[in-house]
Amino acid sequence: MKKSDSSSSLVFSGIQIEINNNYGSGSGSNNNNNNNNNNNNINNNNNPNNNPNNNGPPLRPSSEWVLLSSSQPTIATTTNLTTNAPLSDSMIMNYVGNDNLNTPITPSTSSPYLKRNNSNLNSIIENSNNSSPSNAITRNNSFNMDPNNNNNNNNNNNNNNNNNNNNGEYMNSSIVFDNNVNNNNNNPNNNPNNNVHSNSHNTNNSITHSGSITSSNSNNNNSNNNNNNNSNNNNNINNSVNSVNSLMMNSDKNCNHQFPSDDVLISNEHDIIDLALNKEFLNQYRIQTNSIFINSQHVINQDVQSYQDYESLLSSYNTILNQLLLITSSNKNNNNNNNPNNNNNNVTSPNSLLSPPSTSQLQQQQQQQQQSPSPPLNNNNNNNNNNNNNNNNNNNNNNNNNNNNNNNNYYLMSTSTMSSTTTNLSTSTNSNINTNIPTNYNMSTSITATTTTTTATNTIAIGTTTTAAITTAATNSTNSNNLNLSSTNLGLDNNFLYQRILPEILSLLEKLTVFSRNNDTEIFNRLGNNVKLIFDHLNLIKNDILEANFSHLSGIFTIYNHTIISSDKTTKQFVFRFLHSLAPMTVPPAIVVTPELKKVVQKIHFSKPTFTPLCIEWKEICKYIDVLKSVSLFIAQVGQYCFLNQSIIINDELLFIPSIYVLFDNIQNLSMKEERFHIEYILHNLKFIVSKIPKQTREFTKTEIERLYSYIRGNPSYVKEILPKLLKNIYIDPYFYHLWNNHCIHLLNNNINNNNNNNTNNSSNNSNNNNNTNINIGKDIGNDLTLLLVSNKNSFLLSFDERHFSIFYSSISNSTTTTITPTITSPNNNSNRINNNNNNNNNNNNNNNNNNNINVNNNVNNNNVNNNNNNNNNNSNQYIVNYFDNTTSLLNFIESNQFKYIILSNKEVETIKFFKSVLPVTLPLPQPSSRQAILQQQQQQNYKPRILCGPCLSRFKTILDEFDNEESIENQIYSNYLNNINNNENIDPNLIDGNENKINGNDNNNNHDDDEKTNNNNNNNNNNNNNNNNNIYNNNNIEDYNNNNDNNYNFENEINDKENEFRELEKEINEIEKEEQELIKEYLELENRNQINLDIKQKLEDILKEIKLEEKTHYDLVNNYYQEYFDLKQEDEIYTNQINAIRDQLERVSQIDINKITFKIELPNTGVNGGIVGYNESSNTTISSINGFRLGTLSNLKVDWEEINSAWGETSLLLYVLASQLEFNFQNYKLIPMSSKSIIQSKNDKMSYTLYGGDNIQFSRSFLWFGASDQRFDSGMEAFLSCVNDIATFVQSKKPSINFNYRISKDKIGDSNRLLSIKIAGNSELNWTMALRFMLSNLKKILDNLDSIVESKQKQQQLQRQQSLNNL
């Protein structure tokens, strides 16, 4: 059979993403589902040519896990489950079946994984999808060569059990993971005395409100078998449920050890079995652990009191969720009662659902189920069984269908999840569509209980579990014994019940707030803060109740993928871990089968609050420089890219994701502007952030940029809601990141015009209406694609395989044609196949021929059946399969509007192989900074290992031993299988021919009659023929043996000779063995010597390493010494040069006479006899100066009094400095130099005299004429001259060698020839000026000899001191 690839998809709240993946192998047709031990039935579906799994050995047998503990009773084959969630028709045992290690996690679950049932090998429940051989003990001591022969039906006299399509277009079974609900075995052909459970692959099944599964094609058995199976189912179902609940509610907490957050999914997990199971997941999730989490993650050590408080809060939380779920389920149950075909006499009130049923009520219900056989609760073959003689019993049973177990659903509710919906879908009901489909109500964000006065909508669980939700007409039943609630009253009652729970929610919110404030602890697991999750979830529920909006959608996550049912355990582990890494703990994934697609596709649903924190371990992110906060835009002309002229640095790792949300929230308004460059700016921001994620993230392609442009232009909310979530997943989730980098995730060009949810059509009240009303959303798209294409406006599509889209669609029926073939794509050769498993239209074929491959002839027959069904007013959907190589062709077909319903499905794939090829062994981590390295080192130092108590250690060891034993058994089974294959290759061809003849004879006898009795007779005849053939074959073997004995007698002598030779050879062999033993001893001695030599060599090498290390240390010390020496020497030279430079400067400064520089006196030239050269008034040199100020005036050269006064101030300052340095005190006067206003004060009478004059002073022009003068000024000059005379006398006393040129007498000064007065009165300008010059000359004489005078004075003082000492 050709392997064909198909697609599965994943829709993530606002994000649709496509993922490419290679199919490892097509899903083989599981045709060999019935292995009748009594040989009364020959399975004609054993076609090795159509089964690719027969071409080679099976996969390695995987461990089989059951949810029941060893002390619980075994679950028998069941056909009816009292469950609150929809079950797949062919998967009843996966919660208790093998390969299923991924139980949905709820806070009340004792373990996130499943326990192993080791009590009885015969009770191991086998999965129909398990491709490994089963244990011989569980297979009635017969080794099954075909890995697909998983069902052993004893005493099965019916050949119409394997009505399975052999196309391989879809999986024949599906797995149901729906919180506390186990799967169901839908084949009622099992013997109740047989403990081996079989999973039939009947696809024409339906799902009822009670969660039971009925098989329409398997009801052709005798009544005894049916009754036994039904009673057996009713006896064992409650045991299964009680076992599940007891295991989930009672967890063994042997000690207070803690698990790292990346190992478990529940914070309060203490079951030691999880630690043992951890080795199963260690290798698979090391990649994710290395990418997101670090080994130094905090280990929370909580005290008992805080933990008890947390568990009490969690218990209250679960109680509220249970009550909400009961109210929601009451809506669903009352909708069942409103069904006109429902003859249920039970009266269920919404108020009665607030408490679980009592034990007596459960026992009564079980006894009622055991007293009468449980017929199929919902059979879709009311009018389609006219052409088959074997369906008479089935028609009789259809008249008594009821939902007796409907009221038993509510004690199997989910304790942690609740439903939320996207849209309300409605179509009119018909006889072929089960209108009583229960939905999986999982608590995630809000309550779904939307009802109207005319319709009671079965809303969709976990963000709409069914994409083709059928709206049932809310009409009053005609049965007088039923108490039905109208939809209006039901909505009001539920609203009242929701309001009653509101105070409990508010109270728990207050307790959660107090708990988070009072306890400085963090109850973290790998999915986030549980307390925070509960708080956010309850707030969402509270808001929904207050707003009376019970169908509000806060988030949806849907996976359309069949890899979950692969027998490859690692694939399922990967998929579930991938889901759990994205989902909160309180909203685990649940697998649900929709009513329209229950035989074709399965969907995994769980919803997620919008603002729920996901993975906690954040890594340091780069500095992001692009935030729009009141910043103007600068538009570049090249490339239409926009840049900011202001930036904000975000370097806090905890603010990266929030800052992205803030950024896109701020720039959302730009997308609503008409200019193109605004959207270009948004795209530039997106590309910039992706390029800065520290994982070398790939850039967007041109096609993706164009699609993003169209998305943003079409829907402005796309910027705020979708893009941040895409970046968040790339940044947080390692799988998402690597799939993105390897071009497995890219944008889907979804050009379908999406409308709001208000386009939902109400279904008709007439349940017999044959015209279905599809939901008009843009194009005419069926309900099965509604969730995929409408749940989120412009979104990404994530599919694990995109190589080929396998699409099933129902054509538009009209009066002329029944099938419209699309012209956009060219389908493969398999496109003309018809899905015979839908709508139960396989009744025209013989019992045995229904299991054959469908061909073109079957297509014609089935078309006839569809026409007949239309005449009988039965709406039978005909599904045609096409293959599309790319997404564009699929979307073109969708837009062509050539179908009524469309179904996306895919086959079993080995996804994990592709992921292993994509993901490296260890993901690269960004290099931590020095600060991060220090923090990580400190965290590692603070890390405390887990300490287990004695019971835990012993239990842990016991479980590991069990694992090892079972693994060895599985290895033995697998090796036996390989040995059997090798033995089969050596079988005598004659025996093979005989077996083929026997099988061919049986096949010929099974193809004659259509009547059931005739088939049974033929089967018996075939068995007799087989026995006869076996007897003849045995007789021939006896004759051949006698002939061989005659010949063997002649060769006895030769045999004796050979025996003698054999003995001699044995002796030689013994001798050789002795020699071999000696050689082995020698070899061992040499090995010992060699080992000793190696030890010596190793010691010498160690010594050599130590010597080299010491030598290296020595040379390092020497190098350091010389390095320090040369550094010090260089510093010494630098300091020496600095000292020399300072000394030179000091010498130059010391040679400078500060007094001469400060007081610069200029005198006119003098003659030989002391006279003045050019003694006339015209000579400018007559006037002396000090520091540039002239002291005196002439008749022909007038000097301003300001300059004269300044000169007098400098002169008084000079005299004051000389007296200070000579330590001389004037006897009569005190100098007060004040620049141009200097004065001199008498010490006797304290009179002050000025040393400055003014313009009022006039000199005498002749001897007889006196001028005007200032008496104080003249007295001051006379006093000043007296001071000069005193200091000159003091200098001569100290140093007699100094001779002054001019002598002073009272107010006159002069040489030996002439004395000139220093007063102005009666004096001329020339004489006054000359007198001042003489005075400055004497002062200059003292100034020039000041140093020698001081030195002479010091010497005299020393002599005096010496004399005084001598005198003493």
UniProtKB/Swiss-Prot annotation:
* Mutant lacking the gene: phenotype: Impaired survival when exposed to pathogenic bacteria S.typhimurium associated with the accumulation of S.typhimuriumin in large vacuoles which fail to undergo autophagy.
Annotated GO molecular function terms are: phosphatidylinositol 3-kinase binding; protein-macromolecule adaptor activity
InterPro entries listed in its UniProt record: Atg6/Beclin (IPR007243), Atg6/Beclin_C_sf (IPR038274), Atg6_BARA (IPR040455)
Q: Name one GO biological process term.
A: autophagosome assembly
Q: Where is this region: Disordered?
A: 24-64, 122-249, 331-431, 819-874, 992-1048
Main localisation:
membrane
According to Swiss-Prot or TrEMBL, what is its membrane topology?
Peripheral membrane protein
Which residue ranges have biased composition labelled Low complexity? 24-57, 122-135, 148-167, 179-246, 992-1005, 1015-1048
Q: Which Pfam families match?
A: APG6 (PF04111)
Looking at the record's lineage, which domain of life comes first? Eukaryota
Q: Where is the composition biased (Polar residues)?
A: 136-147, 168-177
Q: List keywords of the entry alphabetically.
A: Autophagy, Coiled coil, Endosome, Membrane, Protein transport, Transport
The residues the entry assigns to the signal sequence are none
User: Which ranges of the sequence are coiled-coil?
Assistant: 1047-1150
Q: Name one GO cellular component term.
A: phosphatidylinositol 3-kinase complex, class III, type I
Query: Where would you find this protein in the cell?
Result: Endosome membrane
- Which family does the UniProt entry place this protein in? Belongs to the beclin family.
State the protein's name: Beclin-1-like protein A
Phylogenetic lineage: Eukaryota, Amoebozoa, Evosea, Eumycetozoa, Dictyostelia
